[in-house]
Amino acid sequence: KDIESQGYIAPADCVEVRVTLDERERLVYATAEPEERYRLASSTDRKYRVVEALIARHPEEHILVIGQYLDQLHEMGERLDAPIITGETPVKERERLFEAFRTGEVRVLVVSKVANFSIDLPEASVAIQVSGSFGSRQEEAQRLGRLLRPKESGHTASFYTLIARDTVDQDFAQNRQRFLAEQGYAYTILDAHAIAA
């Protein structure tokens, strides 16, 4: 927070948006093996509508949709008509897409864990995290870090984390958020209905 107040990084609003699994998803989740539960909760269909609503809330901003599960990211890219960058994306294509994002030709970019490391996208002012590496504090900091480059406009960045309520997804999110709270970032918690009515 000290370096934020000195202008070295942008201020950020951190928002957790809680979705509720539908009846079918809850049944599948309840009967799943423990190691499958996080993936099921992270990939709930309810998150897609919330992502679309959040993008609509930020019509002029550069947005990163970040996740862990490739099938989820590919479906997200298709639904949003947005390009996808994963570890499978050739380096030249990644560079082309990153440049298109920087210049504004591409406004929404769907990215996997490759975005956690060594990319500089100061134009990004909104990140929507749909899934992550369990309770990784390092990953949370890296993803928030994508947004904290100083903005020419002095604009506040927005960091959204989409969580499936009453699941291990919510448990892991609390661990990641605890780290950011220790760094001085507060989370606002919203119900998905407040975003995607």
Specify the residue positions occupied by each region the protein language model found.
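Conserved helicase ATPase core of P-loop NTP-dependent helicases/translocases
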Residues: 62-66, 71-119
